[in-house]
Amino acid sequence: MPRRRVVGQRKILPDPKFHSELLAKFINVIMQDGKKSTAEKIIYKALDVIAEKKGANHLDVLEAALDNVRPSVEVKSRRVGGSTYQVPCEVRPVRRNALAMRWLVEAARKRGEKSMALRLAGEMLDASENKGTAVKKREDVHRMAEANKAFAHYRW
């Protein structure tokens, strides 16, 4: 492994419609097989559905949903003397966002609505009201970290 220099974080270009970097990142998380235009259509349709249902600013609903899904702690496996412990660790801010987006998309894909846009809109609305599968996932991760608090001294 070369020891030249640390490669910096790439700047992500804001999305074309709302000029939001957060939304651009979310589009990249939704995207499958490199089909970015399809991912953009899904996101924008979901935001339109949210605007119809809520009447509020749809970007605020997205931000609220992500706030309610972001984990503050997670567990990592650590092998100590032949046994593996689940060690609770704090989550870096960039990873918090990434996990929140990933969990929102995974939860939306498991929902029953007809189109992905409707599923995503439903999950974002649920998450903004502190309910739904993605919020449950965050609570499970926090519960796991709380249960393994005794192993916190194994942090690295």
UniProtKB/Swiss-Prot annotation:
Keywords: Ribonucleoprotein, Ribosomal protein, RNA-binding, rRNA-binding, tRNA-binding
SUPFAM superfamilies: Ribosomal protein S7
Pfam name, any one: Ribosomal_S7
Gene3D superfamilies given in the database record: Ribosomal protein S7 domain
Molecular function terms from GO: rRNA binding; structural constituent of ribosome; tRNA binding
InterPro entries named among the record's database cross-references: Ribosomal_uS7, Ribosomal_uS7_bac/org-type, Ribosomal_uS7_CS, Ribosomal_uS7_dom, Ribosomal_uS7_dom_sf
GO cellular component: small ribosomal subunit
GO BP, one annotated term: translation
Family named by the database record: Belongs to the universal ribosomal protein uS7 family.
Listed HAMAP family: Ribosomal_uS7_B
Function in brief: One of the primary rRNA binding proteins, it binds directly to 16S rRNA where it nucleates assembly of the head domain of the 30S subunit. Is located at the subunit interface close to the decoding center, probably blocks exit of the E-site tRNA.
Subunit structure: Part of the 30S ribosomal subunit. Contacts proteins S9 and S11.
Protein name, entry field: Small ribosomal subunit protein uS7
